[in-house]
Amino acid sequence: MAIKGPRKHLKRLAAPANWQLPRKVKAFTVRPSPGPHSMDKSLPLLLVVRDVLKYADNAREAKKIIQTGKILIDGLKRKEYKHPAGLMDVLSIPEMDENYLVLFDESGRISLKKTDKADAKLCKIVNKTVIKGGHIQLNLHDGRNQIVKVSDATKAEEDVYKTGDSVLVSIPEQSIVGHVAFGEGKLAYVTGGKHVGEFAKIVEVENRALYSDIVTLENKDGEKFKTVKPYVFIVGQDEPVISM
């Protein structure tokens, strides 16, 4: 019999390897709802509350906590326990004065890091288009689209945003307040591959026509390594522009 509609269940053994989740305790776990992040780069809010933050002993308790609306993602209340919290999302609990940034640890697992501020987040530009009216629409890594109004999109001085750059988005206003261009000398955060979770400076960018560009980086220990451009997330010049 054919499958009708999206899958609603997820076995623990089939869950992404980077989830911090015991595999053999039970058969099933929570499948994140379709949303701003892919399944391998996010965690359902229920797992964040129960398994990462340890604020609940079971799913029932975690659901009750989430349904109170006291947990915010990027400044917005999220009451759906399947909602995905993904890379660079800012998770806030105002009642406890706690803020967390969703990152990858050096084993590639999705983790939360405490942060001092929750007034902005970094977003990577993954694509951009010119829309009706001649304005530029930036497509960001977390599913959001930001429109940049320009008088002429063909002028380089107005079209300053490039694919691979990062923008600083204010929370909760969701407007662009900063821009970090992709290029040599910039500080990057590696989001995939052998060096996932590392901060490193871009040394060289090798442009390729048919494949992803190759980026050479140097970490704090002076070790140089190469990765593909989709794994490179620009976070600042010498230091990250947000607390990471």
Curated annotation (Swiss-Prot):
GO terms for molecular function: rRNA binding; structural constituent of ribosome. The keyword Protein biosynthesis does not apply. PANTHER family: 30S/40S RIBOSOMAL PROTEIN S4 (PTHR11581), SMALL RIBOSOMAL SUBUNIT PROTEIN ES4 (PTHR11581:SF0). PROSITE patterns: RIBOSOMAL_S4E, S4. Transmembrane segments: none annotated. Keywords: Ribonucleoprotein, Ribosomal protein, RNA-binding, rRNA-binding. It holds the Pfam family Ribosomal_S4e. One of its GO terms (biological process) is translation. This is Small ribosomal subunit protein eS4. CDD domains: KOW_RPS4, S4. Residues 43-106 form the S4 RNA-binding domain. InterPro entries: Rib_uL2_dom2, Ribosomal_eS4, Ribosomal_eS4_central_region, Ribosomal_eS4_central_sf, Ribosomal_eS4_KOW, Ribosomal_eS4_N, Ribosomal_eS4_N_CS, S4_RNA-bd_sf. Belongs to the eukaryotic ribosomal protein eS4 family. HAMAP family: Ribosomal_eS4. The lineage of its organism: Archaea, Methanobacteriati, Methanobacteriota, Methanomada group, Methanococci. Disulfide bonds: none annotated.
